[in-house]
Amino acid sequence: MKKFYKMSDSEMEIMKVIWELATPVTVTQLLSIFENRKWKIQTMATFLTRLSDKGLIAITKKTKGNIYAPAITEQKYHQLEAQNLLDSMYNGSLQGFLSALYCGGEVDVKEAEELRKWFEKVGEDD
């Protein structure tokens, strides 16, 4: 995936289901899962086309309809989204992000210790 494309809320709902199913799906299956949303087939097809255009799903064309499968894992998407946030709002600075997150509030001692251990582990991997 060359460029990061953020998903709309509806696209994210659909992707979560596709990731959770962990098997290729059809429009009909997705419409059944989202029957409470009362989306028409064209609406679902539009969402799936957008997800494909963003490089998030792969489409396999079959005679009885397309089959859709994730092109990236959920974990990879979250990594890309986090990196995009870091780059766009904090110039890629993790320290800037953590400072904004902390914002003068109190940090739980246990959480601070877990973060310290995590940073030590990350440092060892380099």
Residue ranges and their predicted role:
Residues 1-17, 125-126:
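Short alpha-helical segments that sit at the start of domains
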Residues 4-10, 62-81:
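Short, cationic-aromatic polyanion-contact patches
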Residues 19-23:
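Short helix-capping/hinge SLiMs at alpha-helix to coil transitions
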Residues 24-33:
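Short acidic, hydrophobic short linear motifs in intrinsically disordered regions
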Residues 32-41:
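Short helix-coil junctions and helix-kink-helix linkers
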Residues 45-49:
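Short, hydrophobic-biased segments on the C-terminal half of alpha helices
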Residues 55:
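Glycine-centered, phosphate/nucleic-acid-interacting loop/turn motifs that mediate DNA/RNA or nucleotide
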Residues 80-123:
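Amphipathic alpha-helical dimerization/coiled-coil segments
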